[in-house]
Amino acid sequence: DRSPWIHIPLGYGKHFSNAAVNWLYSTAANPEGLNRRVVQPRGKVLGGSSAINGMVYIRGHKEDYNQWRQLGNTGWSYEDVLPYFRKAEDQQRGEDEYHGVGGPLAVSDPYDKHPLAEAFIDAAEAAGHPRNDDFNGADQTGFGYSQWTMRNGRRSSTAVGYLKPARKRPNLTVATE
């Protein structure tokens, strides 16, 4: 993750076709999709896809986790995994029932809300859809802004959050080939 473009959010688009940091995977041609192949960017750097993705922080719908538990996956209900989400976060909003602080992953709200995005959210609300100011809180449905894995204008990848603080440990060896 030595490229400055990995750490600067504006660099997001530079990685779609960069074989140095992206495995350049795509789906098989889909007959129902006009035989198109859909590009699936996957990170080929320390931090994996968290180093080249769009930095959107959404944990997933709590009912998905609860369904995994109902299918027999002990330890995977939303209540089971929520403490780990909270522990992983350094939430800009502060600590509460759904969010944690002090973790390795910086999570923040968008700092510049575009008028067109605001109009879209307002239109959804006017059409009867709920506005949601926290998709990682009590409810995951509705329209609103998602949070980012970014702090002070820099990406918070797993390499930055987890590996960088541990890189000098005597019991850690990082192999990249």
Q: How would you name each of these model-derived features?
A:
Residues D1-E177:
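N-terminal redox-cofactor-binding region of secreted/periplasmic oxidoreductases
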